Amino acid sequence: MSNVLKLLVLVLLSAGCTPAQTPSPHGDAKPVVLQKNEGELRTRKPREGVASPSTDFLLKIGPKTSGSKHLLLFTEELAPGAAIPKHKHHGEEEILLIQTGNAHVWLGDKEFDVQAGGLIFIPAETWISLKNTGQENISLVAVWNEPGFEEMLRCGSVPKGQAVEPISRDGVRECYHHGDAELEVVQPVDKKP
Protein backbone atom coordinates (compact mmCIF):
# COMPACT_ATOMS: atom_id res chain seq x y z
CA MET A 1 0.00 0.00 0.00
CA SER A 2 1.44 3.36 -0.96
CA ASN A 3 2.15 5.97 1.69
CA VAL A 4 -0.52 8.26 0.20
CA LEU A 5 -3.13 5.48 0.38
CA LYS A 6 -2.12 4.66 3.98
CA LEU A 7 -2.44 8.30 4.90
CA LEU A 8 -5.87 8.49 3.24
CA VAL A 9 -7.07 5.38 5.13
CA LEU A 10 -5.76 6.84 8.39
CA VAL A 11 -7.54 10.15 7.73
CA LEU A 12 -10.81 8.38 6.87
CA LEU A 13 -10.62 6.15 9.94
CA SER A 14 -9.90 9.06 12.25
CA ALA A 15 -12.58 11.29 10.72
CA GLY A 16 -15.20 9.86 13.06
CA CYS A 17 -13.08 10.42 16.15
CA THR A 18 -13.91 13.38 18.32
CA PRO A 19 -10.97 15.67 18.98
CA ALA A 20 -10.09 16.57 22.53
CA GLN A 21 -12.47 19.23 23.78
CA THR A 22 -10.90 22.55 24.59
CA PRO A 23 -12.67 24.59 27.22
CA SER A 24 -14.71 27.45 25.84
CA PRO A 25 -13.63 30.89 27.04
CA HIS A 26 -17.33 31.48 27.65
CA GLY A 27 -17.75 28.58 30.09
CA ASP A 28 -21.10 26.87 29.99
CA ALA A 29 -22.91 29.72 28.21
CA LYS A 30 -25.22 28.48 25.50
CA PRO A 31 -27.50 30.27 23.07
CA VAL A 32 -31.13 30.19 24.13
CA VAL A 33 -34.45 31.43 22.80
CA LEU A 34 -37.09 31.97 25.47
CA GLN A 35 -40.71 32.83 24.86
CA LYS A 36 -42.55 35.39 26.99
CA ASN A 37 -43.52 32.99 29.79
CA GLU A 38 -40.39 30.80 29.77
CA GLY A 39 -37.70 30.91 32.43
CA GLU A 40 -37.37 30.14 36.12
CA LEU A 41 -40.77 31.25 37.47
CA ARG A 42 -40.63 32.35 41.12
CA THR A 43 -42.94 34.03 43.66
CA ARG A 44 -41.59 36.73 45.97
CA LYS A 45 -42.10 36.23 49.69
CA PRO A 46 -44.19 39.04 51.22
CA ARG A 47 -42.38 41.09 53.86
CA GLU A 48 -43.56 40.75 57.45
CA GLY A 49 -45.44 43.86 58.57
CA VAL A 50 -45.52 45.39 55.07
CA ALA A 51 -48.69 45.40 52.99
CA SER A 52 -47.11 44.03 49.84
CA PRO A 53 -48.62 41.16 47.87
CA SER A 54 -46.50 38.30 46.59
CA THR A 55 -45.53 38.85 42.98
CA ASP A 56 -44.19 36.50 40.37
CA PHE A 57 -41.09 37.06 38.28
CA LEU A 58 -39.12 35.13 35.68
CA LEU A 59 -35.36 34.66 35.85
CA LYS A 60 -34.54 34.28 32.18
CA ILE A 61 -30.78 34.69 31.66
CA GLY A 62 -28.08 33.95 34.24
CA PRO A 63 -25.52 31.34 35.27
CA LYS A 64 -28.08 28.67 36.23
CA THR A 65 -30.53 29.33 33.39
CA SER A 66 -28.22 29.86 30.41
CA GLY A 67 -24.66 29.66 31.72
CA SER A 68 -24.19 33.40 31.25
CA LYS A 69 -21.14 34.80 33.01
CA HIS A 70 -21.71 38.43 32.09
CA LEU A 71 -25.46 39.11 32.08
CA LEU A 72 -28.50 38.63 34.26
CA LEU A 73 -32.01 39.29 32.98
CA PHE A 74 -35.42 38.90 34.57
CA THR A 75 -38.96 40.06 33.85
CA GLU A 76 -41.66 41.10 36.29
CA GLU A 77 -45.16 42.56 36.42
CA LEU A 78 -45.95 45.21 39.04
CA ALA A 79 -49.62 45.83 39.86
CA PRO A 80 -50.93 49.40 40.23
CA GLY A 81 -49.53 50.84 43.47
CA ALA A 82 -46.77 48.22 43.73
CA ALA A 83 -43.21 49.43 44.26
CA ILE A 84 -39.60 48.36 44.08
CA PRO A 85 -38.07 49.50 47.40
CA LYS A 86 -35.20 51.95 47.48
CA HIS A 87 -31.95 50.04 47.05
CA LYS A 88 -28.58 50.14 45.31
CA HIS A 89 -26.22 47.60 43.81
CA HIS A 90 -22.60 47.77 44.91
CA GLY A 91 -20.90 46.34 41.87
CA GLU A 92 -23.44 45.97 39.10
CA GLU A 93 -24.98 48.38 36.64
CA GLU A 94 -28.66 47.84 35.88
CA ILE A 95 -31.08 48.70 33.10
CA LEU A 96 -34.85 48.70 33.62
CA LEU A 97 -37.03 48.71 30.50
CA ILE A 98 -40.66 49.62 31.15
CA GLN A 99 -42.60 47.68 28.50
CA THR A 100 -46.10 48.62 29.66
CA GLY A 101 -47.53 50.93 32.30
CA ASN A 102 -46.38 54.12 34.01
CA ALA A 103 -43.81 54.44 36.78
CA HIS A 104 -42.58 57.16 39.08
CA VAL A 105 -38.85 56.64 39.57
CA TRP A 106 -36.47 57.93 42.22
CA LEU A 107 -32.96 57.72 40.75
CA GLY A 108 -30.16 59.10 42.88
CA ASP A 109 -31.45 62.48 44.05
CA LYS A 110 -33.81 63.02 41.08
CA GLU A 111 -37.38 61.94 40.25
CA PHE A 112 -38.83 61.00 36.88
CA ASP A 113 -42.08 59.76 35.38
CA VAL A 114 -41.43 56.94 32.93
CA GLN A 115 -43.99 55.62 30.46
CA ALA A 116 -44.14 52.41 28.41
CA GLY A 117 -41.05 52.10 26.24
CA GLY A 118 -38.96 54.14 28.68
CA LEU A 119 -35.61 52.94 29.91
CA ILE A 120 -33.74 53.60 33.16
CA PHE A 121 -29.96 53.15 33.44
CA ILE A 122 -28.73 52.71 37.02
CA PRO A 123 -24.96 52.92 37.59
CA ALA A 124 -23.48 50.95 40.51
CA GLU A 125 -23.86 52.68 43.90
CA THR A 126 -26.92 54.65 42.71
CA TRP A 127 -30.09 54.54 44.83
CA ILE A 128 -33.17 53.47 42.83
CA SER A 129 -36.85 53.12 43.69
CA LEU A 130 -39.86 52.74 41.43
CA LYS A 131 -43.63 52.83 41.97
CA ASN A 132 -46.42 51.89 39.59
CA THR A 133 -48.50 55.09 39.46
CA GLY A 134 -50.77 53.96 36.62
CA GLN A 135 -53.99 51.99 36.34
CA GLU A 136 -52.44 49.01 34.56
CA ASN A 137 -49.65 46.59 35.40
CA ILE A 138 -46.09 47.61 34.68
CA SER A 139 -44.31 44.96 32.68
CA LEU A 140 -40.58 45.43 33.07
CA VAL A 141 -37.33 43.85 32.01
CA ALA A 142 -34.30 44.18 34.30
CA VAL A 143 -30.77 43.56 33.02
CA TRP A 144 -27.50 43.57 34.98
CA ASN A 145 -23.99 43.62 33.54
CA GLU A 146 -22.97 40.66 35.68
CA PRO A 147 -24.75 37.88 37.55
CA GLY A 148 -25.04 37.81 41.34
CA PHE A 149 -28.27 39.62 42.13
CA GLU A 150 -30.29 36.56 41.10
CA GLU A 151 -29.15 34.91 44.36
CA MET A 152 -30.87 37.71 46.29
CA LEU A 153 -33.96 37.18 44.15
CA ARG A 154 -33.93 33.43 44.83
CA CYS A 155 -33.37 33.98 48.56
CA GLY A 156 -36.44 36.22 48.81
CA SER A 157 -38.71 33.97 46.76
CA VAL A 158 -39.83 30.40 46.19
CA PRO A 159 -40.41 28.43 42.99
CA LYS A 160 -43.91 29.15 41.66
CA GLY A 161 -46.42 26.75 43.19
CA GLN A 162 -44.63 26.28 46.53
CA ALA A 163 -46.12 27.62 49.75
CA VAL A 164 -45.14 31.26 50.30
CA GLU A 165 -44.30 32.34 53.84
CA PRO A 166 -43.61 35.96 54.81
CA ILE A 167 -39.97 36.97 55.10
CA SER A 168 -38.71 38.78 58.20
CA ARG A 169 -36.71 42.00 58.22
CA ASP A 170 -33.60 39.97 59.10
CA GLY A 171 -34.43 37.59 56.25
CA VAL A 172 -34.63 40.49 53.80
CA ARG A 173 -31.33 41.80 55.13
CA GLU A 174 -29.69 38.43 54.61
CA CYS A 175 -31.12 38.14 51.08
CA TYR A 176 -29.74 41.52 50.06
CA HIS A 177 -26.35 40.32 51.31
CA HIS A 178 -26.55 37.48 48.77
CA GLY A 179 -26.98 39.93 45.91
CA ASP A 180 -24.27 42.42 46.92
CA ALA A 181 -26.99 45.06 47.20
CA GLU A 182 -28.21 47.36 49.93
CA LEU A 183 -31.80 48.17 50.85
CA GLU A 184 -32.20 51.64 52.32
CA VAL A 185 -34.25 50.56 55.34
CA VAL A 186 -32.08 47.54 56.07
CA GLN A 187 -28.52 47.90 57.31
CA PRO A 188 -26.03 45.99 55.13
CA VAL A 189 -24.27 42.97 56.54
CA ASP A 190 -20.60 42.14 56.20
CA LYS A 191 -19.82 39.85 53.28
CA LYS A 192 -19.14 36.27 54.23
CA PRO A 193 -15.73 34.86 53.24
Q: What does each model-found stretch correspond to?
A:
Residues 2-10:
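Sec-dependent signal peptide recognition
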Residues 11-18:
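Hydrophobic h-region of N-terminal signal peptides that target proteins for export
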Residues 18-70, 85, 155-193:
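A short, N-terminal "cap"/entry segment at the start of jelly-roll beta-barrel domains
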Residues 75-79, 88-107, 143-145:
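Short, conserved beta-strand element in jelly-roll/cupin
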Residues 109-125:
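Short acidic-glycine-tyrosine-enriched beta hairpin
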Residues 121, 136-152:
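A short hydrophobic beta-strand segment most commonly corresponding to one strand
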Residues 130-134:
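Asparagine-centered strand-capping/turn motif at beta-strand->loop junctions
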